[in-house]
Structures are given as C-alpha cells and as structure tokens.
A protein has these predicted regions:
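Long, low-complexity N-terminal extensions
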Residues: 1-277
Length: 277
C-alpha cells in the first residue's frame, strides 16, 4: 500500500495522510467483508439465526435517550438475557442494534475503527453527516444477507457534532440503508409496534410529550416502554424482576455521552413500582 500522499488540511495545520476513508484502506490492503457478495445460504434447513430486539430512542428535555432490552433469541430459544445492544461508537455517537447481533457487532466495530482512523489520519473528527451515511452504506452492503432472510440489521443512531451541531440528532434506517432524521422518536425490533403506539399517544395526546421530560422521567418512560413491549413480544426481555436484569440506557446531550449504571436504572424502576402501590 502507498500511504505517501500527505497533504495539508488538519485542524491544527499539520499534514494529513491519505483520504481518511477506512473502507478504502481495507480495499487497498485486500481485506474483504466476511459476508462475501457471492454468498448463498441454503434454501432449506438453515439454522435459526440469533436475533436481538427491541431498541428505542426519543428526544427529551436535555437531549436524546437511547435504550435497549437485553434479550437475544434464536427462533423460540432464548439464547442470552444480558446482550448489550446499545453501543458507543465514539464520544459523540451511539448505535442501538435490532436484528442479527453477529452482523450488527461487526458493523459497530467497523464504524468504531473507521471513525478513529479518520480522526487520526485527518486530524479532525468525521462530520455528523458522514457518520450517518457510513452506517447506511454498511447496511446497504449487507443487502445480500438481508434478502436471504439472515443477517438483517435495522439500527438506530444517535449522534452530535460538538463543533458545528452540539444538539444531538436521532436517525433510523430501513433494510436498504436509507436514513431518516427522527423528529420525536425512533424504534426498531420485533417489540417496536407496542412501543411506537405508546410513544405516539404520549407525544400527541398525553399533554406531557417526551421533549418536556427530564432525565429521570425519560429513563422511567424507556423502562415502561420496554416492559410493555415484552408483554406482547416474547423476543423482548423488558425488565427481569426475578434476575434483576435491567435494560441498557444511555443519554446524549450537549455535554456528551453518558451511560446510566445499573443502580440508577434500578432506582428509577423501583420508584415507578412504588408509585403504582
């Protein structure tokens, strides 16, 4: 590989190397995706694919909250009840995955490395728009797997550009990689219809839309939504009261990214249950 093409353009006046495109670096090095374009899955007797659901996100008073349950299933089998579906890509970007964990985790790792490679080679962070399109391209590149009914991923992305757009933005995608800016909320996964219906009612008729709620109220709402989704969808874990397994919750504000610890989430849920007595 030839990396000798240095040029000016760094944020601090230093010289940068290459284009900063991580996918170009992989192509030049002869590295290819595990999911080859010519891959063909068996038409019958394919093994049950592990799936991860449900994830949701919405705008609240201070920024964007993004949450996911912890259950991963393969057909009617519960494979794992502590799956991490909400992943930090960098200090300003969060992805929540619904679909095949194997493909989604590979996408997340690729994006983490891509963002870091661009920042180090170009001496500046990748723009918000470029991050949004980078995920869309990975989803589109996964289309052969999606069309065969395996490896589908439909994620949610929360991100901000702290230099030009400090207010967090929320995006959802379709299976072809098209991205959409979510004004109020975004949901994905098999339990999403129930969560979507509740969020639509809250924002339209409750008189207390999500954008008016503080962080604690937003976290409590996310826990309620995932618990409601779990009532009608066996692939959604919700809140496991017996094992004390709680959903993942992260928030993205003007001040940056924050992961809520288990104890904070537990306190929010305990307060909810106490209010019902």
């Amino acid at each position: 590989m030839n990396f000798t093409g240095s040029r000016p353009g760094g944020a601090d006046g230093l010289r940068v190397i290459g284009t900063g495109d991580f996918s170009e670096l992989l192509r030049l090095s002869g590295t290819h995706s595990v999911a080859a374009e010519n891959f063909r899955a068996p038409s019958v007797h394919a093994p049950a694919q592990t799936e991860a659901t449900t994830v949701l996100s919405f705008h609240y008073k201070d920024g964007v909250l993004i949450a996911g349950d912890r259950r991963a299933t393969a057909g009617n089998i519960i494979m794992y009840d502590r799956a991490d579906k909400v992943i930090d890509l960098d200090q300003d970007t969060i992805i929540a995955i619904a679909g095949s964990p194997a493909v989604a985790f590979e996408m997340a790792r690729t994006l983490q490395t891509s963002f870091q490679y661009y920042r180090r080679s170009q001496l500046q962070a990748l723009s918000l728009g470029a991050k949004v399109r980078a995920l869309g391209k990975l989803i589109k590149d996964n289309l052969p797997m999606t069309m065969q009914g395996i490896g589908a991923v439909v994620p949610i992305l929360a991100a901000r550009d702290h230099t030009h757009q400090p207010e967090p933005s929320l995006y959802f995608y379709d299976a072809l990689g098209a991205q959409f800016n979510a004004v109020d909320f975004a949901v994905s996964g098999s339990g999403s219809p129930a969560a979507r219906s509740v969020l639509q009612w809250i924002n339209r008729w409750s008189g207390n839309p999500t954008m008016q709620r503080d962080e604690k109220a937003a976290v409590q709402l996310a826990l309620q939504l995932l618990d409601v989704a779990a009532e009608s969808d066996s692939a959604t874990g919700g809140v496991d009261r017996r094992s004390h397994v709680f959903p993942q919750v992260k928030v993205l504000t003007r001040d940056g990214l924050k992961s809520l610890d288990v104890e904070t989430i537990r306190e929010c849920f305990t307060a909810l249950e106490a209010a019902q007595k």
